[in-house]
């Protein structure tokens, strides 16, 4: 399956990496690499993430990496990465539609 990153997800990963880089640029780079590795695993195991509790829709799922939720939608021939959020943040509905 093909992985597609939404503009919001790209903005979020950039914001988070910049925040981490304030204290440790190397940690920010490692964080980005690990997020991409986690997402790549979805190509083989798209249903490995849990259903997003707030939405309760089978096709919208999340995987957890550290303190972050990587939220994605399973589509016919692709997986769309919708957003990335800290686990303590409220999930804005606009980011998952």
Feature locations, PLM:
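Basic, Lys/Arg-enriched alpha-helical interface segments
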Residues: 2-59
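Enriched for short, Lys/Arg-rich terminal
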Residues: 65-68, 73-97
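Short acidic-hydrophobic surface loop/beta-edge motif
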Residues: 61-63
């Amino acid at each position: 399956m093909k992985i597609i990153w939404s503009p919001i997800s790209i903005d979020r990963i950039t914001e988070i990496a910049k925040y981490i880089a304030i204290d440790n640029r190397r940690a920010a780079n490692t964080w980005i690499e690990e997020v991409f590795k986690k997402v790549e695993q979805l190509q083989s195991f798209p249903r490995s993430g849990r259903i997003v509790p707030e939405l309760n829709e089978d096709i919208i799922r999340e995987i957890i990496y550290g303190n972050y939720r990587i939220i994605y939608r399973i589509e016919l021939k692709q997986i769309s990465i919708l957003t990335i959020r800290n686990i303590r943040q409220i999930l804005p509905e606009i980011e998952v539609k």
